[in-house]
Amino acid sequence: MILTILNLIIVSLVLWLPLFAYGRRSRRMVVFCQRMARSENNRKLFGYGLLILVLMFHATYHGICMGDFGPYASTAIALWLVSPKRTIRLLRDIRASQSVLAFIGILALITTLAPGMYSVGVTLGYVLLAAVFYPSKTIEEHVKDNPVYTNYDELEEETVKRYFA
């Protein structure tokens, strides 16, 4: 019962995080966007956070459905996420193309509904979520110029506009 509750909480993060955080102009979101755009170490930490969520999902799902072979199929995706360089490259490539984002979203929905492929769908959902919150090239190029802002509102507006472009 506890594993089922943990599994539901972990899976619900895919739905609740974008709802409360994506495109918001709060101070926490602006700080998150600025740190992700400026620091390679923060992007690596973000990749490791994604890996931890995927592994936690696998552990709870395997405890619930022991005879299911779905976690074995999605383990390949989890193994790909172990290397920070590959994770960053994967997230950057997914973020760069709207058609790839749409394809992975549709694939995640289809595999979630397919028998035995639920874990693959949730893993793809986590990868899609991480790619959406990954900084765009626009903000990375803008931050390299070290712009000077006169007030916080200007920083907030530019950050949110360029980060999610």
Task: Describe these PLM feature segments.
Residues M1-L8, M56-A73, L90-D93, I110-G125:
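Membrane-helix interface and helix-disruption motif detector
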Residues L3-V30:
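N-terminal signal-anchor/start-transfer transmembrane helix
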Residues V14-P18, L50-M56, A76-L79, L128-A130:
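Hydrophobic core of alpha-helical transmembrane segments in multi-pass integral membrane proteins
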Residues Y22-A37, W80-S99, E141-P147:
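Cytoplasmic membrane-interface regions of multi-pass membrane proteins
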Residues F32-G67:
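Membrane-helix boundary elements
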Residues R43-I52, S97-L113, D153-V160:
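Small-residue-rich segments of transmembrane alpha-helices in multi-pass membrane proteins
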Residues R95-V148:
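Alpha-helical membrane-associated segments of multi-pass integral membrane proteins
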Residues T138-A165:
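Short, highly charged, low-complexity non-transmembrane loops/tails of multi-pass membrane proteins
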